[in-house]
């Protein structure tokens, strides 16, 4: 039970970190005065992609772990480390550079682009053999809720919190990457 709680906390922190990326993008998107129905669909779509993408990543990660053994663990840690650094660096870019229309096919591309990070994290987690269902449900839940929060708060806080939220998420992933790389 103690091990499950530890895994739940660690996975929740990762899910939160990935959700912060969606939150920061949603803050910027919230400036466009979306209707509540649109906000609902955007959150659901991003949540679904944060379930699908890490699932695909975990599937591939387990395959790589089986094929390459212990070296795959170092690859997983390095991926998290690089992903964290990338999130921190891009957090200082303008949000408008990443905006895609949140309607129709644009919403699908938007959700896909926001959830690409979760594929890489899923790949790393698949190498380590985490609980798949727990992981993808946490990723989907956190990203959906944080997207909704970002969209709702966007008008008020985008200028102040936007870059910092993604930087916080990147810092958490970077820390997990370091932990995985240097745990002997």
Swiss-Prot record:
Report the membrane topology from the UniProt record.
Answer: Multi-pass membrane protein
Cellular compartments annotated: Cell membrane
Q: List the record's Gene Ontology CC terms alphabetically.
A: plasma membrane
> This protein is called what?
Putative manganese efflux pump MntP
Role played = Probably functions as a manganese efflux pump.
Note the Pfam families from the entry.
Mntp
Protein family: Belongs to the MntP (TC 9.B.29) family.
Q: Where are the transmembrane segments?
A: 8-28, 39-59, 68-88, 103-123, 132-152, 162-182
Q: Which UniProt keywords apply?
A: Cell membrane, Ion transport, Manganese, Membrane, Transmembrane, Transmembrane helix, Transport
Keyword Ion transport included in the entry's annotation: yes
Q: Which gene encodes it?
A: mntP
The keyword Lipid metabolism belongs to this UniProt entry's keyword annotation: no
An MF annotation (GO) of this entry? manganese ion transmembrane transporter activity
Q: Where on the tree of life does the source sit, at the highest rank?
A: Bacteria
